[in-house]
Amino acid sequence: MAIRTKLGDLLRPLNSEYGKVAPGWGTTPLMAVFMVLFGIFLLIILQIYNKSLLLEDINVSWESLSF
């Protein structure tokens, strides 16, 4: 038998949509756009780390992090 708590009563509306699927594609295109932007961000970080994207006056060595 489940015990009713105040926290459970507060969280119940968040679970009311369980099992329901929005018709069509929903927010999939928006998610795809953010995934592409995140991928581009990761590529830029990787290129900076590998020094294949050169930025003037920015040192990416570990020694530059020391005080």
Curated annotation (Swiss-Prot):
Molecular function in Gene Ontology: phosphate ion binding
BP GO terms, sorted: photosynthesis; protein stabilization
Matches recorded under InterPro entries: PSII_PsbH, PSII_PsbH_sf
Domain of life, source organism: Bacteria
Keyword match Membrane: yes
Compartments, record wording: Cellular thylakoid membrane
Ranges that cross the membrane: 29-49
Topological type in the membrane: Single-pass membrane protein
Record's keyword terms, sorted: Membrane, Photosynthesis, Photosystem II, Thylakoid, Transmembrane, Transmembrane helix
Any one GO cellular component localisation term in the record: photosystem II
Cross-referenced NCBIfam families: PRK02624.1
UniProt similarity note: Belongs to the PsbH family.
Quaternary data: PSII is composed of 1 copy each of membrane proteins PsbA, PsbB, PsbC, PsbD, PsbE, PsbF, PsbH, PsbI, PsbJ, PsbK, PsbL, PsbM, PsbT, PsbX, PsbY, PsbZ, Psb30/Ycf12, peripheral proteins PsbO, CyanoQ (PsbQ), PsbU, PsbV and a large number of cofactors. It forms dimeric complexes.
Primary role: One of the components of the core complex of photosystem II (PSII), required for its stability and/or assembly. PSII is a light-driven water:plastoquinone oxidoreductase that uses light energy to abstract electrons from H(2)O, generating O(2) and a proton gradient subsequently used for ATP formation. It consists of a core antenna complex that captures photons, and an electron transfer chain that converts photonic excitation into a charge separation.
Protein name: Photosystem II reaction center protein H
Species this protein is from: Synechococcus sp. (strain JA-3-3Ab) (Cyanobacteria bacterium Yellowstone A-Prime)
Taxonomic lineage: Bacteria, Bacillati, Cyanobacteriota, Cyanophyceae, Synechococcales
